[in-house]
A protein has these predicted regions:
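NTP-dependent nucleotidyl-transfer catalytic core
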Residues: 1-236, 274-282
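Active-site cores that bind ATP or allylic diphosphates and position pyrophosphate for catalysis
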Residues: 144-295, 303, 352-353, 358-362, ...
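Short amphipathic alpha-helical coiled-coil/interface segments
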Residues: 2-9, 349-357
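Extended, non-catalytic structural segments that build the interaction scaffolds
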Residues: 299-307, 311-318
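Hydrophobic, mid-to-C-terminal alpha-helical segments
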Residues: 265, 297, 330-356
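Glycine- and acidic
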Residues: 58-65, 91-97, 243-251, 309-315, ...
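A conserved active-site cap/scaffold subdomain adjacent to cofactor or substrate pockets
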Residues: 255, 304, 317-343
Length: 459
């Protein structure tokens, strides 16, 4: 048996790591199922603090500046699951406060993605719908000495923030109200003035060093046109919208961790209700970029076919690749809600998908990199295959003459004189083989099922 073991080991060691992985998954996928992850996916998410049945309101707030991907799916699934867990409500809110980035096609793509995931919001709205209300809260914050108008250039602002120093605009309280009227009435243009939060320039949390709350963007907005040029940043719009929308539990990715202090302070100054803020980690895959920043160059440089390329983790790409919404949901829930940065393999998502589609899928034979085998002395034969090994999905017939194709990986193990069985067909013995040209000749031997010869898939 040792010569055989040695032969197998030599073949395996000659393969690249990726080829070994493909071979392992293709032949022994069931044995590799992540049992613990599957069990965990069937349990509920951990309970929320200060949550009452029937009163929980969550929100999914994507910016319509790109196509939705698996990271958006994670956030959407989690907030919907919590809304369902507490018999509450889910708001889909487009945080569309940057006219330079927002496009109608992205609103539509996000809606299509949410629909495909079988997520049904109780309310759909745009932050831009409340732009004048946000202006009124901006004025109120200035009146309460919680913000001021800054006319410094960007370089000065950056330098002073890094040094923890205040600019003259913050100190010039006499002109704050006058400048406030000017900025809300359209007196200033792009880069001439911004509204900044009056925080703590000495804070170790740099997010509290007078961040920008409003800036001027002189560009047409896809929803409201050119009516407005003074637009709130996410730092200002998010807490206001969450509070007035009745959101009880606001889920934010870990990247906003330092900005949660600002979130709460803005609401406290304005005497608005403060939602519970829950942080969770973003979703990234091992060896697969997820963020738009990393995917965009691949699309622009035409390294992929577009945003729906099945190699990408966009929802359009995952759909084209054959993933089901339920597999994505189970995968997300298996990860749970945690701050720890993990990069699961996409093979885990694939395993969830296999489990779901197993009972729905016909079994077909497939060979990657075909190797041609011409068979001598074999009578034409009609082979009948079951479309599923255990379920009634019918049959298919294949008429075989004297040519079949096997996988190049299987062909690498063959040599002259070796007998193999073509699954559900018959046995053949190799009489000639050229591995470089990917072709060979074999003799038909018999139809007997033998235990000691390898069984190979063919088409």
């Amino acid at each position: 048996i040792m010569p055989k073991v040695k032969e197998i080991l030599e073949h395996i060691n000659s393969l690249s790591i990726q080829e070994q992985r493909i071979l392992l998954i293709s032949r022994y996928a069931q044995s590799l199922e992540p049992k613990k992850a599957i069990e965990k996916s069937e349990t509920q998410l951990p309970p929320l603090i200060n949550a009452e049945l029937g009163k929980v309101i969550t929100r999914f707030p994507p910016e319509p500046n790109g196509y939705p991907h698996i990271g958006h799916a994670k956030a959407a699934v989690i907030v919907e699951e919590y809304a369902k867990m507490y018999s509450g409500k889910l708001i889909l809110r487009f945080d569309d406060t940057n006219p330079l980035n927002e496009k109608i096609e992205f609103y539509e793509a996000i809606m299509e993605g949410i629909s495909w995931l079988n997520i049904i919001p109780d309310l759909i709205k745009n932050t831009s719908d409340d732009i004048y209300l946000l202006h009124s809260y901006g004025k109120k914050l200035i009146d309460k000495n919680g913000a001021y108008i800054c006319t410094c250039d960007q370089t000065t602002i950056h330098d002073l923030r890094s040094k923890g120093l205040s600019c003259q605009c913050r100190k010039d309280s006499e002109n704050i109200l006058e400048n406030s009227d000017k900025i809300f009435n359209g007196h200033y243009h792009h880069n001439e003035a911004i509204i900044r939060f009056k925080g703590n320039m000495n804070s170790n949390n740099t997010a509290m060093r007078d961040p920008t709350l409003f800036r001027i963007i002189e560009s047409s907005h896809p929803k409201i046109g050119e009516k407005v040029i003074l637009w709130p940043t996410y730092d200002f719009a998010a807490p206001i919208e969450d509070s007035i929308d009745g959101v009880t539990h606001a889920f934010r990715t870990k990247e906003y961790e330092l900005r949660n202090e600002l979130y709460r302070q803005i609401l406290n100054i304005l005497d608005l209700r403060v939602p519970e803020v829950i942080e969770f980690s973003r979703l990234e895959f091992e060896g697969l970029p997820v963020s738009k920043r990393k995917l965009k160059p691949l699309v622009e440089e035409k390294k992929v076919e577009g945003w729906s390329d099945p190699r990408l983790p966009t929802l359009m790409g995952l759909k084209r690749r054959g993933f089901t919404p339920e597999a994505i949901r189970r995968f997300v829930l298996s990860l749970g809600i945690t701050l720890s940065e993990t990069k699961p393999s996409i093979e885990i998502l694939e395993s969830f998908n296999r489990k779901i589609i197993d009972s729905q899928s016909k079994r077909l034979l497939f060979v990657n990199v075909p190797f041609k085998i011409t068979i001598k002395n074999a009578e034409p034969k009609e082979v009948i295959f079951k479309n599923h090994p255990s379920l009634e999905m019918g049959y298919r017939k294949i008429n075989v003459k004297n040519i079949v194709f096997i996988s190049n990986l299987d062909a690498e193990k063959l040599n002259i004189g070796r007998e193999i069985r073509l699954i559900d067909l018959y046995n053949i013995k190799i009489s000639w083989i050229d591995k470089d040209k990917k072709k060979g000749i074999a003799e038909y031997t018999d139809d007997i099922i033998k235990e000691n010869i390898e069984k190979i898939e063919w088409v």
